[in-house]
Amino acid sequence: MSGRRAAGARSTAGDVRLRAVRLIAFRGANSVAANEAGAILDATEVLMHELLGRNGLETGDLVSCLFTLTPDLNAEFPAVAARRMGLSRVPLMCAQEIAVPGSMTGVIRVMIHAYSDDRREPVHVYLGETAALRQDLHGAQ
């Protein structure tokens, strides 16, 4: 299988027009002010809203989300924020980043797998201090 599928879009006449879609990975990160549940949830919610909004994604497009946190963040699971946003039918997983000496701390990262228009290029989103991680990306702001 090629990793592509067709999604139907109904016209007003009732016929179905197919558009090509493919499975795409969308990346993003946000900085967290403190190792507190509220700070982790707020940063995650902002990150998810930005990623979904900038890429025109809806809940039904999502296949899965993988969240990671730097080792200094352990007060809450980022998936809790995603569930509160209505992603209750999307498989979510949380993991800890590798503790690389000198790496940025206080960071939540996410990789979203979603079906999107075949012609659309993913917009990766890096917010707050994490914009320094991927200055090569136009969406890193």
Where are these regions (language model features)?
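Terminal domain-initiation and capping elements
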Residues: 1-141
